[in-house]
Amino acid sequence: MKKKILFWVLGILGVLIIGGGIYAYNVYSSVSNTLKEVHQPLKRDQNNSNVGEKVSKSEPVSILLLGADERGDDKGRSDSLMVITLNPKNNSMKTVSIPRDTYTEIVGKGKSDKINHAYAFGGVDMSVATVEKFLDVPINYYIEVNMEGFKDIVDAVGGVDVTNDLEFTQDGHHFAKGNIHLTGDQALAFTRMRKQDPRGDFGRQMRQRQVMQGVIKKGASFSSLTGYGDVLAAIQKNVKTNLTQDQMFDMQKNYKDCLKNSEDIQIPGDGHKAADGIWYYYVPDAAKQDLTNKLRSHLEVTK
């Protein structure tokens, strides 16, 4: 299940399309309408007619999975950043979790800061540009999830089951060790905690993956999604992507086997306070170059 981080949205939509039986037409129509609403091109791509060619040609692609911590009118920051590369030629997938406190240049701001601040400064467009600059790899697509509203998606599928390896209390919810069931509100608190975890941001990233995987597990059974309208309403409200409907379906069809050969990558570095008293995560140039080389090779990028 750990391999399916990217496909939690695509998987649910795909299941609704192909598993609906006699409801197929109504489901397809509803999904189609939802995908039109969640589609939001990057500014750089609005006049680029070739933006979807990589998926249609089944070429290696990269996707930024961005969890935005938006609360009310507060634009927030990116709470979670994962870069996923898919190579359908050798059916392989690599997932890189970027610590949100990573110190790097914020493209378009003329200064360096925590990488998750790019979202607060310039939304998903600046986040994509900053991640591209940091990793020195092209980001072809993005999927943005509003983590505050993610609880609606969890509730829409009837909650999720996870295995918790650390007892803690967060936002008024207590989480015991072992197998536990989470409602939407509980899932949000479960994925936000990091200060009580000795693993810090890495521990939180692990919990975020568990919850996303739990959503996929529920989505794998159409019988559990008879209220698919609630799922689509939650997705429409809380998800944005520059993937079109056709690209999503092509990806669901042609890139699935990439999950069979998956590698999760953590970025090595050192976290400490800078002279300004702010805590940053610093990635050595050599470690970053090694990561860049690995991702560029996987994407078959030569220049």
Curated annotation (Swiss-Prot):
EC number(s) for this protein? 2.7.8.-
Q: Per the UniProt entry, what is one GO biological process?
A: cell wall assembly
For side Cytoplasmic, which residue ranges? Answer: 1-4
Q: Which GO terms describe its cellular component?
A: plasma membrane
Q: Where in the cell is it found?
A: Cell membrane
Give GO terms: molecular function aspect only. phosphotransferase activity, for other substituted phosphate groups
Give the top-level enzyme category.
transferase
Q: Does the keyword Cell membrane apply?
A: yes
Q: Which residue ranges does UniProt annotate as crossing the membrane?
A: 5-25
Q: Which residues lie on this side of the membrane: Extracellular?
A: 26-303
Q: Which Pfam families match?
A: LytR_cpsA_psr (PF03816)
Give the highest taxon in the source lineage: Bacteria
Topology term for the membrane:
Single-pass type II membrane protein
> What's the chief localization of this chain?
membrane
Keywords, A to Z? Cell membrane, Cell wall biogenesis/degradation, Membrane, Signal-anchor, Transferase, Transmembrane, Transmembrane helix
What pathway is it annotated to?
Cell wall biogenesis
Family, per entry: Belongs to the LytR/CpsA/Psr (LCP) family.
Q: What does this protein do?
A: May catalyze the final step in cell wall teichoic acid biosynthesis, the transfer of the anionic cell wall polymers (APs) from their lipid-linked precursor to the cell wall peptidoglycan (PG).
Please identify the protein, giving its name as recorded: Polyisoprenyl-teichoic acid--peptidoglycan teichoic acid transferase TagU
Q: Which organism is it from?
A: Bacillus cereus (strain AH820)
